[in-house]
Amino acid sequence: MEEKQNNKSLQTQLYYWGNTPTEQDYYNLQGIKSTKSFFTSPRNLTLFTRSWLPSAKTPPRGIIFMVHGYGNDISWTFQATPIQLAKNGFACFALDLEGHGQSQGLKAYVPNVDFVIDDCLSFYNFVLTQNPEFQDLPKFLYGESMGGAICLLIHLKSPSMFNGAILIAPMCKISDKVRPRWPIPQFLTILAKFAPTLAIVPTADLLDKSVKVPEKKIIGGMNPNRYVGKPRLGTVLELLRVTDYVSSKLCDVNLPFLILHGSADVVTDPEVSRELYQLAKSKDKTLKIYEGMMHSLLFGETDENVEIVRSDILAWLNDRC
Protein backbone atom coordinates (compact mmCIF):
# COMPACT_ATOMS: atom_id res chain seq x y z
CA MET A 1 0.00 0.00 0.00
CA GLU A 2 2.80 2.43 0.94
CA GLU A 3 4.62 1.69 -2.34
CA LYS A 4 1.42 2.44 -4.33
CA GLN A 5 1.00 5.73 -2.47
CA ASN A 6 4.62 6.69 -3.23
CA ASN A 7 4.14 5.88 -6.91
CA LYS A 8 0.95 7.97 -6.98
CA SER A 9 2.82 10.84 -5.35
CA LEU A 10 5.57 10.63 -7.96
CA GLN A 11 3.00 10.59 -10.75
CA THR A 12 1.34 13.67 -9.29
CA GLN A 13 4.68 15.51 -9.16
CA LEU A 14 5.32 14.63 -12.75
CA TYR A 15 2.16 16.16 -14.07
CA TYR A 16 2.95 19.36 -12.18
CA TRP A 17 -0.52 20.02 -10.91
CA GLY A 18 -0.35 18.58 -7.40
CA ASN A 19 -3.77 18.14 -5.81
CA THR A 20 -5.63 20.29 -8.35
CA PRO A 21 -8.25 18.34 -10.33
CA THR A 22 -6.84 18.80 -13.82
CA GLU A 23 -3.81 19.92 -15.74
CA GLN A 24 -5.64 23.06 -16.87
CA ASP A 25 -6.45 23.94 -13.26
CA TYR A 26 -2.75 23.77 -12.50
CA TYR A 27 -1.88 26.13 -15.35
CA ASN A 28 -4.56 28.53 -14.07
CA LEU A 29 -3.02 28.47 -10.59
CA GLN A 30 0.38 29.21 -12.11
CA GLY A 31 -1.10 32.24 -13.84
CA ILE A 32 -0.34 31.02 -17.35
CA LYS A 33 -2.28 29.74 -20.34
CA SER A 34 -1.51 26.50 -22.13
CA THR A 35 -2.83 24.87 -25.28
CA LYS A 36 -2.13 21.65 -27.13
CA SER A 37 -2.97 20.70 -30.69
CA PHE A 38 -1.74 18.89 -33.79
CA PHE A 39 0.12 20.53 -36.65
CA THR A 40 0.44 19.08 -40.14
CA SER A 41 3.89 19.66 -41.59
CA PRO A 42 4.55 20.35 -45.30
CA ARG A 43 5.40 16.67 -45.77
CA ASN A 44 1.99 15.78 -44.33
CA LEU A 45 3.34 14.55 -41.00
CA THR A 46 1.06 15.00 -37.97
CA LEU A 47 3.01 16.58 -35.11
CA PHE A 48 1.83 17.19 -31.54
CA THR A 49 2.37 20.76 -30.29
CA ARG A 50 2.00 22.72 -27.06
CA SER A 51 2.14 26.36 -26.02
CA TRP A 52 2.73 27.94 -22.62
CA LEU A 53 1.77 31.61 -22.51
CA PRO A 54 1.76 34.41 -19.95
CA SER A 55 -1.66 35.38 -18.62
CA ALA A 56 -3.79 37.80 -20.60
CA LYS A 57 -2.82 40.49 -18.08
CA THR A 58 0.87 40.09 -18.98
CA PRO A 59 1.74 40.69 -22.65
CA PRO A 60 4.70 38.49 -23.63
CA ARG A 61 8.16 40.06 -23.66
CA GLY A 62 9.62 37.49 -26.02
CA ILE A 63 8.90 34.28 -27.95
CA ILE A 64 10.79 31.05 -27.29
CA PHE A 65 10.68 28.15 -29.74
CA MET A 66 11.76 25.00 -27.91
CA VAL A 67 13.23 21.68 -29.08
CA HIS A 68 13.40 18.59 -26.86
CA GLY A 69 16.14 15.96 -26.86
CA TYR A 70 16.41 12.41 -28.18
CA GLY A 71 13.86 10.00 -26.70
CA ASN A 72 12.13 12.81 -24.80
CA ASP A 73 8.86 14.67 -25.45
CA ILE A 74 7.22 17.98 -24.51
CA SER A 75 4.51 16.70 -22.14
CA TRP A 76 6.43 15.22 -19.23
CA THR A 77 9.42 16.66 -17.37
CA PHE A 78 10.33 18.97 -20.27
CA GLN A 79 7.39 21.28 -19.69
CA ALA A 80 8.57 22.41 -16.25
CA THR A 81 10.91 24.86 -18.02
CA PRO A 82 8.37 26.52 -20.37
CA ILE A 83 5.93 26.79 -17.47
CA GLN A 84 8.50 28.81 -15.52
CA LEU A 85 9.39 30.89 -18.56
CA ALA A 86 5.71 31.68 -19.21
CA LYS A 87 5.32 32.78 -15.59
CA ASN A 88 8.13 35.24 -16.28
CA GLY A 89 6.55 36.73 -19.39
CA PHE A 90 7.74 34.55 -22.26
CA ALA A 91 5.47 32.85 -24.79
CA CYS A 92 6.81 29.32 -25.36
CA PHE A 93 6.02 26.93 -28.21
CA ALA A 94 7.23 23.39 -28.88
CA LEU A 95 6.41 20.28 -30.85
CA ASP A 96 7.16 16.60 -30.43
CA LEU A 97 9.70 15.77 -33.12
CA GLU A 98 9.03 13.03 -35.65
CA GLY A 99 8.97 9.64 -33.92
CA HIS A 100 8.77 11.20 -30.46
CA GLY A 101 5.97 11.77 -27.95
CA GLN A 102 2.58 11.99 -29.59
CA SER A 103 3.84 12.88 -33.06
CA GLN A 104 3.60 10.62 -36.07
CA GLY A 105 6.47 8.29 -36.91
CA LEU A 106 8.15 5.12 -35.70
CA LYS A 107 9.28 5.59 -32.10
CA ALA A 108 12.73 7.19 -31.83
CA TYR A 109 13.37 6.80 -35.55
CA VAL A 110 14.76 9.96 -37.14
CA PRO A 111 15.78 9.06 -40.70
CA ASN A 112 16.70 12.60 -41.77
CA VAL A 113 17.30 15.55 -39.45
CA ASP A 114 17.06 17.93 -42.41
CA PHE A 115 13.34 17.10 -42.59
CA VAL A 116 13.04 17.76 -38.86
CA ILE A 117 14.55 21.22 -39.37
CA ASP A 118 11.94 21.94 -42.03
CA ASP A 119 9.16 20.72 -39.71
CA CYS A 120 10.32 23.06 -36.96
CA LEU A 121 10.68 26.10 -39.19
CA SER A 122 7.29 25.46 -40.76
CA PHE A 123 5.67 25.28 -37.32
CA TYR A 124 7.45 28.39 -36.03
CA ASN A 125 6.38 30.38 -39.11
CA PHE A 126 2.83 29.12 -38.64
CA VAL A 127 2.83 30.37 -35.04
CA LEU A 128 4.04 33.81 -36.12
CA THR A 129 1.49 33.97 -38.93
CA GLN A 130 -1.35 33.07 -36.57
CA ASN A 131 -0.15 35.59 -33.96
CA PRO A 132 0.84 38.80 -35.77
CA GLU A 133 1.25 40.55 -32.41
CA PHE A 134 4.38 38.38 -31.92
CA GLN A 135 6.12 39.60 -35.07
CA ASP A 136 8.03 42.46 -33.42
CA LEU A 137 8.97 40.61 -30.24
CA PRO A 138 12.46 39.11 -29.67
CA LYS A 139 12.49 35.49 -30.85
CA PHE A 140 14.70 32.86 -29.24
CA LEU A 141 15.55 29.22 -29.83
CA TYR A 142 15.86 26.83 -26.91
CA GLY A 143 17.18 23.30 -27.26
CA GLU A 144 18.14 20.47 -24.94
CA SER A 145 20.81 17.94 -25.97
CA MET A 146 19.89 16.78 -29.51
CA GLY A 147 17.53 19.76 -29.54
CA GLY A 148 20.54 22.04 -29.07
CA ALA A 149 22.14 20.68 -32.24
CA ILE A 150 18.82 21.11 -34.06
CA CYS A 151 18.67 24.76 -32.90
CA LEU A 152 22.10 25.38 -34.38
CA LEU A 153 21.02 23.77 -37.66
CA ILE A 154 17.86 25.92 -37.68
CA HIS A 155 20.03 29.01 -37.19
CA LEU A 156 22.40 27.98 -39.98
CA LYS A 157 19.45 27.48 -42.33
CA SER A 158 17.62 30.67 -41.29
CA PRO A 159 20.33 32.95 -39.84
CA SER A 160 18.27 36.12 -39.52
CA MET A 161 15.05 34.70 -38.03
CA PHE A 162 16.08 34.51 -34.36
CA ASN A 163 17.54 36.95 -31.86
CA GLY A 164 19.36 34.34 -29.80
CA ALA A 165 19.56 30.75 -28.63
CA ILE A 166 19.68 28.94 -25.29
CA LEU A 167 21.57 25.66 -25.66
CA ILE A 168 21.29 23.16 -22.81
CA ALA A 169 24.05 20.52 -22.99
CA PRO A 170 23.94 20.69 -26.80
CA MET A 171 24.75 17.54 -28.74
CA CYS A 172 27.28 19.19 -31.04
CA LYS A 173 29.22 15.94 -30.93
CA ILE A 174 28.33 12.57 -29.41
CA SER A 175 30.56 11.97 -26.41
CA ASP A 176 33.20 9.29 -26.84
CA LYS A 177 31.98 7.93 -23.48
CA VAL A 178 28.69 6.78 -25.05
CA ARG A 179 29.76 6.49 -28.70
CA PRO A 180 30.00 2.85 -29.89
CA ARG A 181 33.59 1.59 -30.18
CA TRP A 182 35.33 0.20 -33.25
CA PRO A 183 34.45 -2.04 -35.04
CA ILE A 184 30.81 -1.61 -33.99
CA PRO A 185 30.17 1.64 -35.95
CA GLN A 186 31.60 0.15 -39.14
CA PHE A 187 29.50 -2.99 -38.78
CA LEU A 188 26.35 -1.01 -37.92
CA THR A 189 26.83 1.28 -40.94
CA ILE A 190 26.72 -1.68 -43.27
CA LEU A 191 23.76 -3.25 -41.46
CA ALA A 192 21.80 0.03 -41.45
CA LYS A 193 21.67 0.05 -45.24
CA PHE A 194 19.43 -3.02 -45.05
CA ALA A 195 17.60 -2.50 -41.75
CA PRO A 196 17.71 1.18 -40.64
CA THR A 197 14.87 0.82 -38.11
CA LEU A 198 16.49 -2.09 -36.27
CA ALA A 199 16.85 -1.18 -32.57
CA ILE A 200 20.09 -2.93 -31.65
CA VAL A 201 22.74 -0.25 -31.09
CA PRO A 202 24.50 -1.09 -27.79
CA THR A 203 24.47 1.96 -25.51
CA ALA A 204 24.03 2.63 -21.81
CA ASP A 205 20.67 3.79 -20.42
CA LEU A 206 20.68 7.54 -21.06
CA LEU A 207 18.22 8.21 -18.23
CA ASP A 208 20.63 6.66 -15.76
CA LYS A 209 23.54 8.66 -17.14
CA SER A 210 21.57 11.93 -17.35
CA VAL A 211 19.72 12.19 -14.04
CA LYS A 212 21.56 12.63 -10.75
CA VAL A 213 18.75 12.47 -8.15
CA PRO A 214 17.52 8.87 -7.63
CA GLU A 215 13.89 9.87 -7.02
CA LYS A 216 13.89 11.83 -10.27
CA LYS A 217 15.14 8.80 -12.17
CA ILE A 218 11.93 7.06 -11.07
CA ILE A 219 9.85 10.02 -12.23
CA GLY A 220 11.61 10.19 -15.58
CA GLY A 221 11.14 6.46 -16.07
CA MET A 222 7.37 6.79 -15.55
CA ASN A 223 6.93 8.82 -18.72
CA PRO A 224 4.52 6.79 -20.90
CA ASN A 225 5.93 8.44 -24.03
CA ARG A 226 9.58 7.74 -23.17
CA TYR A 227 11.43 5.50 -25.61
CA VAL A 228 13.02 2.66 -23.63
CA GLY A 229 14.41 0.52 -26.45
CA LYS A 230 17.92 0.52 -27.84
CA PRO A 231 18.69 3.25 -30.38
CA ARG A 232 17.73 2.44 -33.96
CA LEU A 233 20.49 2.00 -36.52
CA GLY A 234 19.25 4.73 -38.85
CA THR A 235 18.80 7.23 -36.03
CA VAL A 236 22.28 6.68 -34.64
CA LEU A 237 23.91 7.03 -38.04
CA GLU A 238 21.90 10.18 -38.72
CA LEU A 239 22.89 11.70 -35.36
CA LEU A 240 26.53 10.86 -36.04
CA ARG A 241 26.26 12.52 -39.46
CA VAL A 242 24.54 15.60 -38.09
CA THR A 243 26.84 16.09 -35.11
CA ASP A 244 29.89 15.69 -37.32
CA TYR A 245 28.39 18.37 -39.59
CA VAL A 246 27.55 20.71 -36.70
CA SER A 247 31.02 20.35 -35.19
CA SER A 248 32.49 21.34 -38.56
CA LYS A 249 30.26 24.46 -38.71
CA LEU A 250 30.85 25.90 -35.24
CA CYS A 251 32.76 28.82 -36.76
CA ASP A 252 29.68 29.78 -38.81
CA VAL A 253 27.43 30.28 -35.78
CA ASN A 254 26.62 33.98 -35.61
CA LEU A 255 23.78 34.71 -33.21
CA PRO A 256 23.71 35.59 -29.51
CA PHE A 257 23.72 32.42 -27.44
CA LEU A 258 23.88 31.03 -23.93
CA ILE A 259 25.40 27.57 -23.48
CA LEU A 260 24.79 25.71 -20.22
CA HIS A 261 26.58 22.43 -19.58
CA GLY A 262 27.44 20.21 -16.63
CA SER A 263 31.08 19.28 -16.07
CA ALA A 264 30.04 15.71 -15.19
CA ASP A 265 28.00 15.24 -18.40
CA VAL A 266 28.90 11.92 -20.08
CA VAL A 267 26.15 12.06 -22.72
CA THR A 268 27.21 15.23 -24.54
CA ASP A 269 30.69 16.64 -24.26
CA PRO A 270 31.21 19.94 -22.39
CA GLU A 271 34.54 20.33 -24.21
CA VAL A 272 32.65 20.71 -27.48
CA SER A 273 30.53 23.44 -25.87
CA ARG A 274 33.78 25.21 -24.97
CA GLU A 275 34.86 24.80 -28.59
CA LEU A 276 31.58 26.28 -29.83
CA TYR A 277 32.04 29.25 -27.51
CA GLN A 278 35.59 29.83 -28.75
CA LEU A 279 34.95 29.36 -32.49
CA ALA A 280 31.55 31.00 -33.01
CA LYS A 281 31.49 34.37 -34.78
CA SER A 282 28.88 35.63 -32.33
CA LYS A 283 29.84 38.79 -30.49
CA ASP A 284 27.27 38.11 -27.76
CA LYS A 285 28.04 34.67 -26.36
CA THR A 286 28.01 33.19 -22.88
CA LEU A 287 29.18 29.80 -21.60
CA LYS A 288 28.47 28.40 -18.15
CA ILE A 289 29.92 25.06 -17.05
CA TYR A 290 28.36 23.85 -13.79
CA GLU A 291 30.82 21.91 -11.69
CA GLY A 292 29.62 18.38 -10.88
CA MET A 293 26.30 18.67 -12.71
CA MET A 294 25.19 15.98 -15.16
CA HIS A 295 23.32 16.01 -18.48
CA SER A 296 19.78 16.73 -17.27
CA LEU A 297 20.35 20.22 -15.87
CA LEU A 298 16.71 21.34 -15.68
CA PHE A 299 15.18 18.19 -14.22
CA GLY A 300 17.68 15.58 -13.07
CA GLU A 301 19.69 17.75 -10.68
CA THR A 302 18.75 18.71 -7.13
CA ASP A 303 16.02 21.35 -6.88
CA GLU A 304 18.65 23.86 -5.75
CA ASN A 305 20.78 23.20 -8.84
CA VAL A 306 17.76 23.36 -11.14
CA GLU A 307 16.90 26.76 -9.69
CA ILE A 308 20.45 28.01 -10.34
CA VAL A 309 20.20 27.01 -14.01
CA ARG A 310 16.72 28.53 -14.35
CA SER A 311 17.91 31.78 -12.82
CA ASP A 312 20.81 31.97 -15.27
CA ILE A 313 18.44 31.45 -18.21
CA LEU A 314 16.05 34.14 -17.00
CA ALA A 315 18.86 36.60 -16.32
CA TRP A 316 20.19 36.10 -19.86
CA LEU A 317 16.73 36.55 -21.38
CA ASN A 318 15.91 39.59 -19.25
CA ASP A 319 19.09 41.31 -20.42
CA ARG A 320 17.98 40.87 -24.03
CA CYS A 321 14.31 41.79 -23.69
Indicate where each model-derived feature is located:
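Catalytic active-site module of serine/aspartate enzymes centered on a nucleophile-bearing elbow/loop
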Residues: 291-321
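The serine-hydrolase catalytic nucleophile loop
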Residues: 70-83
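An N-terminal hydrophobic leader/cap segment in hydrolases
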Residues: 1-55, 202-209
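Conserved alpha/beta-hydrolase
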Residues: 82-105
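Alpha/beta-hydrolase-fold enzymes
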Residues: 144-232
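Catalytic nucleophile-loop/oxyanion-hole region of alpha/beta-hydrolase
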Residues: 74-76, 101-138, 304-308
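Short beta-strand/loop motif that positions the catalytic acidic residue
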Residues: 253, 259-261, 265
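Short alpha-helix in the alpha/beta-hydrolase fold that links the catalytic acid
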Residues: 255, 269-278
